[in-house]
């Protein structure tokens, strides 16, 4: 598996930890400012595919129509996150490939690079079901709803 992975040119993998952390605990007390948000958008836009665990990052990748691979190797407590209602809906779209081994990961990477269009219909479903509109006016709509209560 590693030998096959080595055939992919060096320098095409990036591990990003955006934002400012206010705690040593993973996933707790952190914030992303505008610069980090733009960097994340740029990183996804210029990526051939996105590999992450159960995360709204899958929705971000679907918005930019990038193949999505979710890691589920450990079978421990993190595995149960894939069973939660909100994420199960994302998996059911067919727009995300969930892999449970190193071999499945390599196969999914190679297949996604060779045929990025394969899960496109599922990514469209993710956008339709999880995002609704991609017109840049969500803040305006939220503000209008809030103003309607005044």
Predicted features by range, described:
Residues 4-59, 124:
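Donor nucleotide-activated moiety binding/catalytic core segment of transferases
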Residues 35, 39, 101, 134, ...:
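Soluble or luminal CAZymes and related metallo-dependent hydrolases
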Residues 56-133:
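Catalytic binding pocket for nucleotide-activated donors in carbohydrate/polymer assembly enzymes
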Residues 1-9, 82-87:
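Short, aromatic/basic amphipathic alpha-helical patches
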Residues 135-150:
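C-terminal alpha-helical cap of glycosyltransferases
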Residues 41-44, 96, 143:
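Generic hydrophobic alpha-helical scaffold/packing signal
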Residues 42, 103-107, 141:
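An acidic, carboxylate-rich microenvironment
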């Amino acid at each position: 598996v590693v030998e096959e992975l080595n055939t992919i040119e060096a320098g095409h993998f990036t591990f990003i930890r955006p934002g400012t952390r206010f705690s040593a605990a993973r996933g707790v007390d952190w914030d992303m400012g505008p610069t980090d948000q733009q960097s994340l958008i740029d990183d996804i836009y210029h990526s051939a595919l996105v590999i992450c665990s159960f995360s709204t990052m899958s929705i971000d990748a679907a918005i930019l129509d990038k193949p999505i691979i979710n890691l589920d190797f450990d079978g421990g407590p993190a595995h149960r996150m894939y069973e939660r209602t909100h994420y199960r809906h994302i998996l059911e779209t067919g727009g995300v490939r969930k892999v449970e081994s190193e071999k499945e990961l390599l196969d999914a990477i190679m297949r996604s690079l060779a045929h990025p269009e394969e899960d496109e219909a599922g990514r469209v479903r993710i956008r339709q079901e999880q995002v609704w509109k991609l017109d840049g006016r969500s803040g305006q709509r939220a503000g209008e709803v809030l103003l309607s209560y005044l």
